[in-house]
Amino acid sequence: MTLRELNRATLARQMLLAREKRPLVKAIERLLGLQAQLPRPPFTGLWSRLEAFTRADLATAVNTRTVVRGTSMRGTIHLMTAADFLKFRGCLQPSLDLGMRTILGERAETLDLPALLAVARTYFRQPHHFEDVRDHLISKFSGGDERAMGYVVRMGLPLVQVPSADAWAYPAQADFVSAATWLGKPVAACGALGPLVLRYLAAYGPATVRDAQAWTGLSNLEATFAGLGDRLVTVPGPNGKPLFDLPGAPRPDADTPAPVRFLPEWDSVIVTRADERIVAKADRPRVFLPGLRVAALVLVDGMAAATWKVSATSRKATLQIESFKTWPVAVRREVLAEGESLLRFVEPQAKTFDVEVTT
């Protein structure tokens, strides 16, 4: 596969070659998870992928508990279907434990982890803010490192956030509650990792084992890939090295049109990927920022071509786009049109909408 063919294959699976008429929960299931450190980005990501998507669609899904927001892949907050969270969260626990120990180091060795998690598990049968849980843990484990204890709980227990009536369905600092309480059943014990790998390839493939490990946060997936046998195929990548894929997965022609699309910060199709299928090597410093931030991007012809941000007053909404190079007139016109549509989605109360492009 050429790099351009690889680009189109991934965009097709990500619903970025055309907005799809797909039920919201099915779309989130298709993507496996949308990174969601902040409440707003998943809304923009879904708006760019689905026809006629509204804020109310996602707000309804989280309030009816068919979609949840909780700590999962790579120890980060993701939006997932409730079914997928229950199915896969247990499989991710080894990577969360490793991440916790790596970050805390010797601080973790001073803690009685089983006792700490047992206390927190009982506490989170009801919704609580993490500031409150630290106080609670200090009352039970006098002299303990409250920050370290809070991090152990965040990584060690399957918790989800409680939605609210806020504009983006969650407040900036949401309460957490046990997934078992919120969903009425505990997360499943992890069996084989094969189903997770198959779902990853369906959403993000073709890919290498290292790609899957980087996205899930898991290690040593070579045996899992090997065990899937003829449920996988290999295709030669741009550098000649094999990539794994599903036999029937879409691999469109390289000349398939790719419309302008706006992706939010930390969009899951961008994070953890080292190849150049969407972000050219020369542009990576503009995309992958200090503090583990990933910029909000404009895709032009399927590739990262600009960053963007929105500012607003009570009357005016402004979209500021910083392009990586000067665009032809037709491309600029398409970016401006899509950008204004984005503004009207994220700032519907504004009276005027202004899209600015700088290079």
Which positions does each model-derived feature cover?
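Long, low-complexity intrinsically disordered regions
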Residues: M1-I270, A274-E276, A282-T359
